[in-house]
Amino acid sequence: MKRILTIISAAAALLSVASCNLEKFPSTAINSEEAMESVADCKAFRNGLYSGLKYAFTGAYVYYTDLQTDLFHAVKNFGNWGGPFYSYNVTASEDAATSIWFGLYGYIGNANFLIAGTEKLLASGTLDEADTKTVQQYYGEACYIRAHLLFNLSQYFCEDYDPETAGTKFGVPVVTKYAPTADSDKYPHRGTLETTYEQIVKDLDEAEKYVTAAGTVNSAYVTKDVVTARQARVALTMHDYETALLKAKTLIDSGTYKLMSDATAYAKGWVNDNLTETIWRIAMTGPDDYGNTYGYFIYNTTGEEGNDDPQYIPEDWVLDLYDQENDIRYDAYFDEREVSLRFTGTVTLFVKYPGNPTLYSKVSNYAHMPKVFRISEMYLIAAEAAYNIGGQDAVACKYLNDLRAKRIAGYEAQNYNGTALRNEIRD
């Protein structure tokens, strides 16, 4: 009997030890409640947040929307790559669409985690003045990134914003807390488009308050100028044309970002991702650190001349929008090349994304650092906003002419008005 009790006691002790081991936190993991206890922790999570953005702003997140706009024509043997988007047959079960949806919400989750961590640290009262400003900057950046990604989701999955109907149209789920779950019953409702944009504007207001880093050309991080650029784009989308014009004009007038006019420098700038007019460029460091790619438009597995095998080529009407002799954008974006298809000959290809040589070792992987905002967009936002305000056609023309004068050699300013002006801005 004594032996039996001894065995039972020993077994109980083993079960107790096993139970304790099961309850121990894995040595290779971090408790989310204790993940951000210092400025260094916040910086590490901030770096991780930015690292994810190289996927959110490249590849399918960019070109699937282009394929839906009739800018490109699929070659005969394109293998149905991107076919559902090209043929307007995207359904809720389309893997690429769901990947974009879940991908962006994953990055929003990362932003929410950083926001919560910085708020906790700021409320702790343990930071000195310098560290407080640093953590506030990180907080503002995370608020900005959440707003940016929510806006992108609304562009992909919602109708165009109309102030008259935004309160009755579907938006996207607004998620502001880090609470990952596989329980779909806990997922928030889509809500209205108005609610979605209210959160976007609120986050941008927070970013404007706490992001104090000055803008620099090709900044890898969110700066005050990045926030202003997004405010301009959001305001234009919301039909708040006065704000859109004001924000765009602020960046133009700052003189920090110069429009490029040299054809060689402009073309090389797209190849090497060093355009001097870029407000925000997501950093990539080399062949082992890049985002999604753009292989559909060239796709050459050997790197040898004549072996280009594109799935899509630009439509003729797109090429005709450019002054092919004098516009510096034409040779940077397009090139007539021999191709390896079901015929032998030359075709004008879209070569805006040939691959940055620093991001591959032998044959191009067609990877590039995303240039999220450029000053050229601010000129177009200013022009369209001025046109829509009414009575400011001359102002709109000025911004359009200023942009074209830098892009087209020998360009002479034009005096457009009305619908003709609107069409010229959009083209």
Language model regions located:
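Bacterial Sec-dependent N-terminal signal peptides
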Residues: 3, 10-40, 200, 232, ...
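TPR-repeat structural position
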Residues: 197, 241, 392-393
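Conserved, well-structured interaction surfaces
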Residues: 82-157, 191, 208-213, 363-370, ...
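Short, surface-exposed recognition loops and adjoining beta-strand edges that mediate ligand/DNA contacts
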Residues: 32-33, 61-76, 127-130, 157-172, ...
